[in-house]
Each structure stands twice: as structure tokens, then as C-alpha cells.
């Protein structure tokens, strides 16, 4: 039998779909792995243990089981927050909490409370709040919220992070200004009375020769069909006199003959308690846009320029409000809006944008909605912008696509960037992007999978409740996905500039708990508390004895203990305490373990004589190139790295370099290498060199 040596120089393709297991003709095959569980691929090509999770807050008492949402809020270049919204009462109340650098803000508005409640009022067409459909957009110190089943509202930050105002955006107190009008059921009559306009255009008075306006409301239209002229009623002075704004100038100020003009009724505010409310929102070029509403799901509403809550279409001047409906040959309910290179409109049936020639602004007179691709996007998952493109989940929830402008096609295209790893996407619920924070990192897209695998392939079994983590670097054409799991289910994820928050559902002491946690590069366990000098809550001060407290959220759970980089014996938390193996010199960490697995593809050396797929193979030697690693196992064998504690330094040194490992036994058809850890400490694999007997 011959010996073959192979070198895998990186892992920049990530975990490959099992359906591609036989595609040894693809170059991506040789830069991929078969399993990538709880690892993070580096844009340079290596792979590391994923960050651990810092425990932040127990949201169970906020009735988080009813639904939660994480909302990033960037007040300035130096002040960023994460807002947690929970459905405190399914009938009418959302509770908001505010976190700065992982610390819960207290005494909100001087109330002594650590939260702010929003009573949404009467729901439009449902009996319970669906927070998955809560959409939001931010401008300066204000964040606007929409949901088709209750009135839009806004939260505005005050003088500090504990001062917030919560206000309803009221379209009913002055509907002529605040809300656009439309006809749901039209009623047209030709009154038996003359009608005399006071002027041909602008704000005018219309006087009838009989009492025809006694039961007419504002917003209704009057149209002459002898000559021309059309006006919108803005005030009813009496049964014979109304004030109106002309939409089409009248021919003259002469009286229009009886039965020669139409009184068009049925006009009403587009949003109301009987018609529902806006679905989605975004700010774009000085306007607030609402995308769709409960009964007008395909209509785009744009505010007056710099008057964000004025949606009065008025005379159609350049700065007036915009009202445009997607008139297409299929149902296109708007699911999301994004302000990018253009105003992008995502719908259930396809993707649209509003082109702007010569960089002109969008106005009522030049607005044109163009169709680009017909993939459709899933409602409730916000598209994310990354390196000039927009990432979105296809309507069926089975593909991650990138909407990007193509100069060759002079339009947008929607490429499937999850094609090589679609098995990692199962019932997606939320999505967030952490942009590259320095020259050594890439964009990290985090996609939270739901709990319903119905309709998904068998290859997707086991990925419910996980996070599909895509490391992206467009310049290097890197899309490297992995799967992140924890002791429980991930529910939501949000990014506060560079901090990644998540909500995790865990079972603690037999009861369901909902914890807010933060991915932390300095931790190697989940739901972890660290002990060190001058801690930030909820971390604790370094103990002077072997008792580590502050662990009530892990009562009854078996935890891992790391003390000055030394892994102590496992311990079952009792009374909120754990016992350390000694007094720490610098720090200690207590948290839940998570398993790391990296498994290579079946060995295929690409010999001139052909494939070796049908032959048995034996791994003879594996030499990983490691970087700052403290523990690693290869095919269940612990590999000694000579990283012994240094007395007095309070840490274990890391190993960097090549580590030759021999003595692997047994022939298999695949000859795969499984890299894992038996201790929760750091490791990074840059490359693999291995010899196989064929």
C-alpha cells in the first residue's frame, strides 16, 4: 500500500452540505470540513473555538416565553445600547429594558424601575402580540416601531441612558396631515346642485347651490367631468361650503352645472383601528418610509421631506409625501425595507428598488418602482447590509441570498450564498450582522434557527435552536459557515456595534429560563460568570477563598471551572455557589460546557491514477499547525502541548507551531480527522498536514 501526504492550508469554505460529499471535483471541497460545531472560521483561513457566552440578565420574569426581540440602538459614535423587548402581556404590553456594555440600566425616568412598558392598545386582527413582526428603524435619538396590528410608536433617548420617552405616533388626531387617504369602498354620486370654485388652483372654497355636504367628511374628492378639475376636501364649513386643495386645477371659476360633477366618497385614512397599521419602516434621504400595511400590504408610503410623521400627499410637490403601490402580476406583500445604494423593497414575491437617475432625490412625480429578482423574502427577518450587498432569507426559509447591484446587468441580482451549506438553515427566525471590527476579522452573519424542521431535508436534522454563523469576506470570496450550539436553544441575536447579544432558552432545575447573554472572546464557557479585580456586573470580584458566588442562574447545573487557565473538576452549583479548586491569582470563570467538533472531509488525494473513494485508508500521521492553543484532541486522543501553569503568573501559556502526532490505528473508507477538546480552553488550528496509507 502507498503512503500519501496531503496538506489542507485553510478552512475558508466552512462546513459543506452533505449533498456535496461526492463533489471531489470542486476546489471548495479541499478547503472545507464535514462538521464544524461551535467553531469560528477566521478570514485568514484558520479555525478557532467559538467565543463563550457571558451571562447578563434573566428575562424569564418578563414573560419572555411570549416572545422577545433584541434591538440595537446607536446614539452616537461613542454610545451604543441594546434594547430588549419582551411581550409582558400578550394582549397589550411590551416591556423594554436597556443595556449598555452588558449592564442593565436602572431607575428609568426616575421611576425606580429597570424597564419601560408600552401598552399598544387594541389589536387590529389578532388576539395576541406577535413580536416577530415588530419592525423598527432609527434616526438620531429616536427609534420608530411598526406592526400591522397596532399603532406605530417611538422611543426617544433623553439626557442619559436612563431617560427615555415613549410616544404613540398618532395618525387619527389630525388625519388630514398625518395619514394618507385612500379608497377601500368607493361611492360616487352626481349631486343635483351647481358647484362654484373660488379659484382654479391651490387652497380654494367650493360652494354648492344645495345642501350636498351635510354628511360629507374630510378627505373626500370632488371632480368635474365638464372641462377638468379635481380637489380634496380638507374642511367642511357648512352643508353647502367646503374648503379643498386642488389636485388638478379647475378650468375656471364659473359655476359647474348640476349633475356635471362627481362627489367621490369612501376615502378614509389608510391606517386606522379598522384598517390596520404600517408593517415595515426605514429612513431614506430625509423621509420616513412605511412599507405596506394590514390592508394595503403592497403600498409604499413616504413622508414629507424632513417632516417624518406627515404623510399628506397634498399637491404632489417635490417635498410632499409619497403614495405608491406595487402593481405587479403577483402578490407582493412588503416584508422589509432597506436604505442602501437605493431604497430597496423586499416582498413575499420578489425584490424591488426605486432607481434614481443622476442622483436625483425621490419625489412624487418621478418615483418608479422597478422589479429586480423574484425570490421573495421571509417576513419577520430583517435584511442585513454587508459590503455593498444586502443579505436576506428567501421566502421559504431555506436559502440565504445576497441582493447586490450588477454593473453588467444594470440591475440587482440575488445570489444564493448558502448553496454549499444550506443544511445549516432550518426554520430561520432572526438574523444579525457583526461588521468586521479590524483588519484581522471579517463580517460575521448570525442566523438563529427555529424549532420546526418540518419540510426540511434529513441533513438538517439536529440544527434546530442553533445559530448558523457565516464568516464573510467578499474581497477574498470567503463564505465560511459553522453551527453554534449551546445547552438550550438560541431564540434571538442582535449586534450592538461589535458586541453580540443573544437570548437563550435554557432548562435550569427543570424549569424553562430565558437568559440574555453576550458572546465574549475572553470566555470559553456559556452563561458564564467571571471573577476578577474591579468587575463589571454581573461578574463578581475575585474571591479570597474557594467559594465562587453569583451563580443562582445555574443552580443545580454541572459547570466547568477555569481558574487562572487551569481547568478544575466539574461542580454542581448549589445555593448560587460553586467551589473552586484553589484560590485564583488573577481570575476564575464558571459556566456551562459546550462541545467543539471539527471533522475533515473524507480523504481524497487527487492521484493521477484516479480516485481512492472505494479503498480503505488509514491515517498514519497528523500535524496540525496551531496558534495560541491550550488544548486539542485528534480522533479522541489528547495531544500534549506542554502548556503547564507558570507559578505566580495566574495563567497557562499557549502553544504556537506544528504538533506532529503519530500512532493512529485502523483502516476506514473515509479516513477523516476529528479535532475536538476535552477542556474548555482556547485553540486555533491554522492548517493540517497528514499522511494516509492507501
Question: Would you name each region that the model predicts?
Answer:
Residues 106, 114-118, 157, 166-262, ...:
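Autoprocessing Asn-cyclization modules and mimics
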Residues 80-86, 141-146, 288-291, 335-347, ...:
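Short beta-strand elements that form the blades of beta-propeller/WD-repeat-like
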Residues 1-112, 154-159, 163-199, 260, ...:
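N-terminal beta-propeller domains
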Residues 61, 271-272, 327-328, 371-375, ...:
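Surface loop/turn motifs at the tips and blade-to-blade linkers of beta-strand repeat domains
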Residues 360-397:
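Catalytic or ion-translocation cores adjacent to nucleophile or general acid/base/metal-coordination motifs
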Residues 64-78, 125-139, 271-285, 329-340, ...:
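Structural signature of eukaryotic scaffold interfaces centered on beta-propeller domains
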Residues 149, 294, 349, 357, ...:
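Residue-level signature of beta-propeller blades and closely related beta-rich strand-turn architectures
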Residues 2-104, 332, 404-694:
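Beta-sheet repeat architectures centered on beta-propellers
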